[in-house]
Structures are given as structure tokens and as C-alpha cells.
Amino acid sequence: MTQDNSQAKAKAPAKSARRRARELALQGLYQWLLNRNDPGVVEAHLQDAQGFNKADRAHFDALLHGAIREETTLTEAFTPYLDRPVAELSPVERAALLVGAYELVHCVDIPYKVVINEAVELTKTFGGVEGYKYVNGVLDKLATQVRAVEVAARR
């Protein structure tokens, strides 16, 4: 006897436009980290991706181009919280850290816990088995530096 589990399975909530923007930015940063292609070429490639038209375009542009433009500064900001050299990070972890660091520094309208959670979810989706824990720890420590008042108020 079989049972229909279609109703028992919870339907995944629709992705928000910002989540799609983060996913696409992460994918673009991944490509850029591996190939160092011109950001315009990376963006053009992503425009053909499924769901691009449903992404928050302004947020995507800010994340992709901002993280590439400020890669050195953002990397310097989170490097003190790494337990290994930046070169040993997986490209997905590094891209997630760049997205998260950029949002922590520049998107102060987004609560730091949301920024960290979104980076963790990106890493769970695209990264290795335990990579999300690492990204969580690094961004949590970075948040205490760049959003000290907000972190202190929430703890």
C-alpha cells in the first residue's frame, strides 16, 4: 500500500528577489574568482541564467560590481578571522564571504543577522558540506567589527 505524500511535503517558499540577486552575485563572483574575466562579461553571462529576470537587479549590480571593485578591502576585513590563508578557501566560501562582507559594510538597511543567514544559505546551496559553518563564524566575527553597535544591541 502506498501513500500519497504530495500534501505532506512542504512546498518550498518562493525565493525573494534579493535572494535571487545574492545567488546570481555569488555565481558571478565564483566565475570571476576562477577566471578574472571582465565583470561586464561575467554579468552578461549571468543575464541568461534562469531566474535572472526575477532578481533584484539593483542589489545584484551592487553586490557583483561592488564586491569585485572592493575585493582587496573586503578580503582584508575578513582575513583576521580566517584560520587559513585566503588562497586555501574554496571559491564558493570566498564568494560567500565577499557577498556577506559587502552587505555588512554597505547595506546597513539589512540587519546583520539577515546578512549572515543569507551567506550561510548560499554556502549550503552551492558549497561543501561544512563550509556554511565556517562562513557563519567568519561573518559573525566581522559583524562585531563593522556593525558593533547593532551587534551589541541585539546580544
Curated annotation (Swiss-Prot):
The keyword Magnesium does not apply. It holds the Pfam family NusB. One of its GO terms (biological process) is DNA-templated transcription termination. Disulfide bonds: none annotated. SUPFAM superfamilies: NusB-like. One of its GO terms (molecular function) is RNA binding. Keywords: RNA-binding, Transcription, Transcription antitermination, Transcription regulation. GO terms for cellular component: cytosol. InterPro entries: NusB-like_sf, NusB_fam, NusB_RsmB_TIM44. PANTHER family: ANTITERMINATION NUSB DOMAIN-CONTAINING PROTEIN, N UTILIZATION SUBSTANCE PROTEIN B-RELATED. Involved in transcription antitermination. Required for transcription of ribosomal RNA (rRNA) genes. Binds specifically to the boxA antiterminator sequence of the ribosomal RNA (rrn) operons. Belongs to the NusB family. NCBIfam families: nusB. This is Transcription antitermination protein NusB. It comes from Ralstonia pickettii (strain 12J). The gene is nusB.
